[in-house]
Structure formats: structure tokens, C-alpha cells
């Protein structure tokens, strides 16, 4: 049983799309988490000073010291916009994953074209999500004071990169020399 170039590209594209989907879940979870456990594992920004750890997402921030934690809601002006972009990033990453999987099992040029469009929109929403956060003056001031980006932010940026790779693979699969055909069986 052999695979043609189009199927191999489709399988790799599916892998990157799956990773982008998982990372979009982590980014969204870190942004909307409202407890120290959720923010510790997927915060968008964290800081440590004098035995006190601080974790923040879009909607909540938590401080932890000596086994005690205190969380409060952020009054950040951009939290609704960032939450909307994060949710749309998640939805478009999911739609992209489904379209790539469908394309792999039922090759169709129209599905490939729609998949490229959905992937591009997912990239735009992901870029807007981490761009709004990184461009905020309060975040910049915190970073200057010693805070660092957390795993939620990193997941969002990496999701963008993986969607970009999946988009490039999707466009390559549309080229005439990469036409996907059925898997051929042995004689």
C-alpha cells in the first residue's frame, strides 16, 4: 500500500491542525481561568517576588504565597475583546481540524479551498488574541518590572505558527502536482 504526495501532505497538515487545536484550548483556558490551579498551569503572565507568585489571565488574577491563594477579577478593559478573539480562535481551529480530516478521507478541491480560508481566519483571530494582550500598556509595564509571559500566551503564539504551517501545507496540496488520489492497494 502506497501513499501519494497529497496524502502525506494531508497527514502532516492534520497533525499540525490537531496541535493548533490543542494549543488553542490551553490558551483559552488560561485566559478565562478563575482559580489558582487553572492560572498556574496556563496563565498568560506570571511573576514571582519575595515568595509570592502571581498569575494572570484575561479575566482573573491570582496571588499565591505559603500555600494560601487569593484570586480576583481583573478590571482590564480589553478582557471581553480578548476573550472573544480567543473563543473564535478555538472555534476556527476546530473547524480547520474537521475540514482537514474530511479532506484526508474524501479528497475534494472545494473542501481544501474552504479549509485554507478557515485556517487563515483562525490565524487572524489567534493573532488578534495575543496581539491585544501583548500590546496592552499594563502588560508592557509588568514585563518591564520582571513579569514573564506564561504558558497560555506561548500556547496562543504557537497555535498561530502551527496554523500558518497548516495553511502553507493546505495551499501546497492545491498545486496541480500534489493532487490527492485514493490510496493504492497491493496486487
Where are these predicted regions, by residue range?
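A surface-exposed beta-alpha-beta supersecondary segment
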Residues: 24-83
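Non-transmembrane, juxtamembrane loop and terminal tail segments
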Residues: 180-187
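Membrane-interface extramembranous regions at the lipid-water interface
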Residues: 2-5, 66-82, 138-151
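Individual transmembrane alpha-helices with interfacial aromatic-anchor signatures
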Residues: 34-48, 145-161
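Signature of small four-pass
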Residues: 2-34, 78-136, 153-180
